[in-house]
Amino acid sequence: MWAHVALAVVAIPLTLVDLREHRLPDRLTLPLWGGSAVTALLADPDIAIQGMVASAVVVAFFLMAAESPGQPLGYGDVKLGGGLAIQVGWYGIEWALWGVALSIVSGGIWALGALIRRKLSLRDDLPFGPWLLMGNLLALIQAA
């Protein structure tokens, strides 16, 4: 539960920085990832293993996206996704995957609306961190 509190504390600064600077600082993403893992280990080793497997799956998927042409994701998104997947993955790997899916859908809906209103073009970079946080928060609320 303390890891969820830590997530709530860093979610706002992560969102603000990503919206403003299009980056997710290591000083916020790495402690979230490590703190989530340590908290899970202290709470229940079985939960920790489940969360870490979820994290590995999400990180592998996000790394493929970060390395693909055009780099639709940055490495900050990879690290944030890994930390979030540990927390949401406590409730089952499927919930971590739901978190990713909800992130993509919510970000996509927002981007489509912005394109229609001509607030951005297809060439613009979009911060994914806020949508990653929102999608995983929705999955976490549903799972808990």
Write out the residue ranges for each language-model feature.
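Functional transmembrane core segments of multi-pass inner-membrane proteins
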Residues: 10-110
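Juxtamembrane boundary at the C-terminal end of a transmembrane helix
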Residues: 140-144
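N-terminal signal-anchor transmembrane helix
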Residues: 4-7
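Interfacial loop-to-transmembrane junctions
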Residues: 112-138
